[in-house]
Amino acid sequence: MKTVLPSVPETVRLSRRGFLVQAGTITCSVAFGSVPAAAGDTAESTPSIAAVSPNVWVRVHADGIVDIVCPAVELGQGAHTALPRFVAEELDADWDRVRVQQAGASDKVYGNPLAWGTQFTAASRTTVGYFDVLRVAGAQARFVLVQTAARRWSVPADQLETQKGVVLHRRSRRSATYGELVASVQVPESFPHFFARNEATQPADDYFGAAPPSVVAQAAGPASGAIALKHRSTYRLIGKDAPRKDIPPKVNGQACYGMDVQVPGMLYAMVETGPVAGMAPERVDDGAARQVPGIHHVLSLPHGVAVVGRDIFAVRAARARLLVNWKANPDKQSYDSGQVLDEFSDLCRNGIERNAVQAWKQGELSSIDAVFARPDVRIESFEMQSDLVYQAPMEPQSAVIQPHADGSAEAWVGTQWPTVEQGFAAGILGIAPDKLTMHLPLVGGGFGRRLEPGALVDAAHIVRAIGKTVKVIWSREDDLKRNPFRQALACRVEAAVLEKDQRILALRHTVAADSWLARLFPQYFNAYQQTDPGNWIGGMVAYDVPLQRIDALTPRRSVDVCYMRGIGVAQVKFAQESLVDQIARRLNADPVDFRLAHLNTSPRGAAVVRTVAEMSDWKRRSADAGGGMALGLAYTPYSNAHVALVSEVHFNRSENTLSVSRVWCAVDVGMVAQPDIVKAQMEGGIIQGLSVALMERVQVAKGVLQHSNFHDYPMLRMSQVPQIHVRLVETDQAMAGVAELGLLQIGPAINNAFARITGQHLRSLPMRPALAQMKRSGPTA
């Protein structure tokens, strides 16, 4: 029985320039890859069947074009190139003739094995989680095509080879393109097992829970008749660079983002919300708003007032004329971001007395306490605070919902978690989730923000009220105002140091932060002893420190928070790596040598530290440092990857200004899926991490956000971006995720360089406000 791909609606794709001419008449889909015709692939050669789908991931056309479905959403990270190449590798497809189709929403079909089995594009789990799944998909498709050729030529299948979309029988010098075989394909009811030859394909450390069974049988005992997947030494596509499929349409204007989606007959809507999050409308004077030509509806929603009209200009003008009295929300109106941070810091200082949860430990607690009580041990500590941060995707939120007469509906939304959005919206619409078809356009940046529903919830409320197709648009001001931010966090790290041996014997982390997990997914929060691992997992140390303990506090405050790229790891590593340098300075030890002395059991960690020291010419540049310039080092193991980074920092004492001129980064992510994508991810992460470390913070006073747009929420400018040098340290280890790695070290690396210049570390993120208040003389650490 043939399994077909999810149906792709007939759509018209149009450039933004063309949209201006034909607005209101189009929708858009995501399909990448302009493919040339191939010799031998003709409609005449296979007149009866136009295409065949061996499984839900692959469709082979009679003209030789191969469509590959990508389960992950393209956020700019390269998923629509890296993931389809896993399929194409095992299929031996001609990459130039591959088109990429975006999957719809289905955990059952497209769920990520390393993300609770959900269709989840985040947490550096995309390439790792889908690696086996997609290789098997490609191998199944190749199996079908090879069996078809074997039947056609009456030869054993094991005598056949495949190369770039062609099946070959060298003994008889016969060949057939995949397209030529389509008409004869018979898809079996079941496929043989596939096994990997002694290859680890999943990371050992997985904070989403125990790693699930691999989807491929392992070489220790493959089933009889099982077929081996390719060994990495034979890869033709994986590990090699290739032009990204999504770049040409982005350059020529054909790419379809959520903001580009147009559905015939749709109305536009915007929602006015209160000055404090969570306020509901109490009384609405919409008389002036309804006078604006083109306005169809003004609706009170549970969380705001929606204005619906024929075009966005009318809607925006009408919304500005609304007069709304809002119901008080004393809980949220009492929130003050600075006060909350101070409370978190106090909790960290008194964590044990404040019922902190022991989230993780290495060694017995009695042994840890005993080491800290030893008279020959020096106790070093580091405390830090980190403000709320806006994820700041360049594309604000939008969503379209189109209801149908049979009670079903379709939705178009840029999201990192389509099935979660589907569930929220379907619940509001009063239909089953499978009655809401999800279309997933390109996303102009996710960074964790699009893990949570936003504009689609607005659209669902409006569509349920009026029964018409609606597109909801958020302005930049809406996006910032209604955003659940990266959590504020405080951390205290203590180290027991045996000075005579220059060794760290034990570490204690205490972390206090609010939780996104507790708010939206309490079942997972409870599974982690009512803690959020995204907040504290950064405290897990790969250094040779035998005794470690992490205590977590999750005080629930009234502001909504959401995961952000780097989660709490970027914040906790700021404290941890600053402390490591602080200890090295106390001991008059070189920061590189001190780390290497604590990485004897981590050859991968030691390798990236040595590599980045060589890249940055650490010994010479450190010796030449002075005059307000220094190098700073930070190292982080995370999600089966190892990263070391050196920053060259300049500090102007007279103006109290800090800048970063150069960054060197060595990264080991095990097997590399595509080198250029990994480097681009690291560069982007470093830039974002630099912006967050230096200047980004959200301030809330009495529940009111103190920012409205980028003029009062500053971010790093192009002129402030340093030279960035990334080197991949490839090993035979399992593939690791990449997306978050660049953010994790840049903050502490800058801080460590700053301390080498001034003798003191900064103890808050972002750094610029601390610099403005810093005394110009006298160390504080």
Curated annotation (Swiss-Prot):
Catalyzed reactions: isoquinoline + A + H2O = isoquinolin-1(2H)-one + AH2
Instruction: Tell me which EC number(s) this protein carries.
Output: 1.3.99.16
Keywords, A to Z, come to: Oxidoreductase
From the UniProt record, which GO molecular function terms apply? isoquinoline 1-oxidoreductase activity
- Please name the PROSITE patterns in this protein's record: TAT (PS51318)
Membrane-spanning segments: none
Q: How does it assemble?
A: Heterodimer of an alpha chain and a beta chain.
> In UniProt terms, what function does this protein have?
Specific towards N-containing N-heterocyclic substrates, including isoquinoline, isoquinolin-5-ol, phthalazine and quinazoline.
This chain's protein is named Isoquinoline 1-oxidoreductase subunit beta
Give the organism, scientific name.
Brevundimonas diminuta (Pseudomonas diminuta)
Q: What is the lineage of its organism?
A: Bacteria, Pseudomonadati, Pseudomonadota, Alphaproteobacteria, Caulobacterales
Gene giving rise to this polypeptide:
iorB
